[in-house]
């Protein structure tokens, strides 16, 4: 609404024609859960703006309830961990009744907006380049969507001084891959395999108190399932980057 009000006031002469503003809507992963309907509407109308999502995997400002991007089987205030549970939506161990994290960039890709990107502060140059590209797109082509992985030391139960490193581990495990989609063409902007930095998801999970329980022998089957899903998504993403028609 603010974007359209601005352009209408410019048309009427109430705002100078040469006033140049970049409109950015900032949302957490919780806002992208609750506000997914309006976000999709914004995408389908292709408004000239940027949607910037910072994803810390939970509803943190209300005490850390799980969101749809909370790591699979992670502990939260609404996902119990203990002998009968393995986290995430009161998952009862052995039943497999929980879900994997929501792939919001691919949801946005389905709306065919001009530009989609993922970023991480562990890779600052990549971050800045994509932010500049998103600004250009928002001024000349329509909607740009950027998703950043964002640390929450308090609720992740990991030391604040290690957060950039923890985020980098998520990227190197391909749990949070770095890529962009511009007019339907997918480009991997960082491939940990090429720099011999590829690591298993367990290497990221062990850095956070909310997922450490998954490294215990009792959860081997669940951990294998998580790794398989992350690998599946990574291989699909690589295939998209290698074949422009995908």
Each PLM stretch: what is its role?
Residues 1-65, 123-134:
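Thiamine diphosphate
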Residues 16-20, 70-137:
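Conserved thiamine diphosphate
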Residues 48-50, 115, 143-145:
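Beta-sheet entry/capping signal
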Residues 53, 118-119, 145-149:
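Short, conserved beta-strand edge motifs with alternating hydrophobic and charged residues
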Residues 67-71, 162-165:
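Short, hinge-like loop/turn segments at secondary-structure boundaries
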Residues 140-143, 176:
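Active-site lining segments that contact anionic ligands and/or coordinate catalytic metals
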Residues 150-246:
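Flexible, low-complexity linker and terminal segments
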């Amino acid at each position: 609404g603010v974007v359209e009000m601005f352009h209408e006031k410019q048309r009427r002469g109430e705002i100078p024609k040469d006033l140049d503003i970049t409109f950015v809507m900032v949302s957490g992963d919780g806002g992208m859960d609750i506000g997914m309907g309006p976000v999709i509407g914004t995408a389908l109308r292709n408004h000239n703006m940027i949607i910037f999502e910072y994803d810390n995997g939970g509803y943190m400002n209300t005490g850390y309830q799980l969101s749809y991007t909370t790591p699979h089987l992670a502990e939260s205030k609404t996902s119990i961990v203990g002998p009968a549970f393995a986290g995430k939506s009161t998952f009862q161990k052995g039943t497999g009744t929980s879900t994997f994290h929501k792939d919001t960039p691919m949801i946005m890709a389905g709306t065919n907006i001009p530009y989609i990107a993922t970023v991480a502060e562990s890779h600052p140059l990549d971050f800045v380049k994509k932010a500049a590209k998103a600004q250009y797109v928002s001024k000349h082509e329509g909607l740009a969507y950027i998703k950043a992985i964002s640390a929450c030391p308090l609720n992740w139960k990991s030391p604040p001084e290690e957060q950039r490193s923890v985020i980098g581990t998520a990227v190197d495990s391909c749990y949070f891959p770095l890529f962009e989609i511009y007019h339907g063409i997918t480009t991997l902007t960082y491939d940990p395999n090429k720099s011999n930095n590829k690591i298993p998801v367990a290497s990221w999970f062990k850095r956070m108190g909310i997922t450490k329980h998954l490294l215990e022998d009792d959860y081997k089957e669940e951990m294998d399932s998580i790794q398989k899903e992350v690998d599946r998504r990574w291989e699909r993403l690589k295939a998209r980057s290698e074949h422009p028609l995908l």
